[in-house]
Amino acid sequence: MNPYFYELAKISANKAAENGIIVDPKWIYAQWHVETGGFTSNLQATHHNLGGIYSSSGSWMYFNDFPEFADYFGRYLTYYSEDGMAHTSSLYDYVAALHTGGYFSADISTYYNALLSIVNTIPF
């Protein structure tokens, strides 16, 4: 586990909570870990974009630094409120809301299991 990125996930979870979305920072961390290939992607390095987030123009969103991304991502999760994000109580609910909202189109079980394998490595 990367403590720096886990702290950022906590920032995102807190920002989401300010907007009525309650998610475990472990879920966010796991999502970012999967999306960045273990925090090694070029997009992460060049755009501080841990989630593969696109702008409305269809290009990758650029963030000045990782804390800016973490703040944005917490607010971004509110876009999935109607897809079930407002009522998540488990990792599966979180993944299902993202899938329903179109965040990813891969098989839901595959994505869920990828995140679960990361969550299970977090020692607390």
Pin down the residues of each PLM region.
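Catalytic cores of secreted/periplasmic lytic hydrolases that degrade extracellular macromolecules
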Residues: 1-124
